[in-house]
Curated annotation (Swiss-Prot):
Keyword Membrane applies: no
Residues engaged in binding Mg(2+): D70
UniProt EC number: 3.6.1.66
Biological function: Pyrophosphatase that catalyzes the hydrolysis of nucleoside triphosphates to their monophosphate derivatives, with a high preference for the non-canonical purine nucleotides XTP (xanthosine triphosphate), dITP (deoxyinosine triphosphate) and ITP. Seems to function as a house-cleaning enzyme that removes non-canonical purine nucleotides from the nucleotide pool, thus preventing their incorporation into DNA/RNA and avoiding chromosomal lesions.
Cofactor detail note: Binds 1 Mg(2+) ion per subunit.
Lineage of origin: Bacteria, Bacillati, Cyanobacteriota, Cyanophyceae, Acaryochloridales
One Gene Ontology biological process: nucleotide metabolic process
Protein's name in the database: dITP/XTP pyrophosphatase
Pfam families cross-referenced by the UniProt entry: Ham1p_like (PF01725)
Organism this protein belongs to: Thermosynechococcus vestitus (strain NIES-2133 / IAM M-273 / BP-1)
GO CC entries: cytosol
C-alpha cells in the first residue's frame, strides 16, 4: 500500500513524471504533473532553495504532497557556473554547450559536477525532506554521443569512460546526480514504511 495515494511533481515534463514514478513506486500511488496553467519561477539562489520553493508552492496551490527538483552543472574553473542558471545559459542545448565550451576554451581544469536536489513538501507547503545527488566529471572540448540532453554530450564521467550522451538511459540513471537523489528519496520513504 502506498504511503502517499497521490502527489504532484512540480514539472510540466511528462517524461520526468514517468521517471520519478518509476523510482518512487510503491511509495506513491500516482504521481501527476503540475497543471500547465501553473508556472513556478526559480527565483532562489541555490539548488536547495529552488527545489524547496517549487515543492512548497506546488503543494500549497494543489493542496497535496509535492515533489520538486532543481539541478544543474557546476564547473570548478567557472566558480560553479552555470550552476542554477544551467537551463538559462542559452536558448537551446546547442547554444548552452557552445557558450560553455567558448568560456572554457583556454581552461586546463575541466573538473565539473552535476548536482540535483529533490524536495518533498507536505500539503501545507512545509518541507518534509530534501535529498541531493552529485556526479563528478569533466567537460570535454567537443561533444560526444547522441543520447541525453542538455550538457550530456560534453560531460565526461571518468568512472564510466563515457559521456552521459554515450550512455543508455538506464546506465545514466545508475550514476547520475538525479538517480542518486531519487535513490535517497526512496530510502527516506523506506524509513517511513519499514
Amino acid at each position: 500500500m502506498p504511503i502517499l495515494a497521490q502527489a504532484v511533481l512540480a514539472s510540466h515534463n511528462a517524461g520526468k513524471v514517468k521517471e520519478f514514478q518509476g523510482w518512487l513506486q510503491p511509495w506513491i500511488g500516482e504521481l501527476v504533473a503540475l497543471p500547465a496553467a501553473i508556472e513556478i519561477a526559480e527565483t532562489a539562489d541555490s539548488f536547495v532553495a529552488n527545489a524547496c520553493l517549487k515543492a512548497a508552492t506546488a503543494a500549497k496551490v494543489m493542496g497535496e504532497w509535492a515533489i520538486a527538483d532543481d539541478s544543474g552543472l557546476a564547473v570548478h574553473a567557472l566558480q560553479g557556473a552555470p550552476g542554477i542558471y544551467s537551463a538559462r545559459y542559452g536558448a537551446t542545448d546547442a547554444e548552452r554547450i557552445e557558450r560553455l565550451l567558448r568560456e572554457m576554451a583556454d581552461v586546463s581544469d575541466r573538473a565539473a559536477e552535476f548536482i540535483c536536489v529533490i524536495a518533498l513538501a507536505r500539503p501545507d507547503g512545509t518541507i518534509a525532506v530534501t535529498t541531493e545527488g552529485r556526479c563528478a566529471g569533466e567537460i570535454l572540448t567537443a561533444p560526444r554521443g547522441q543520447g541525453g540532453f542538455g550538457y550530456d554530450p560534453v560531460f565526461w564521467v571518468p568512472s564510466q569512460q563515457r559521456t552521459f550522451a554515450e550512455m543508455s538511459p538506464v546506465e545514466k540513471q545508475q550514476v547520475s546526480h538525479r538517480g542518486q537523489a531519487l535513490q535517497r528519496l526512496r530510502e527516506y520513504f523506506q524509513t517511513l514504511n519499514p
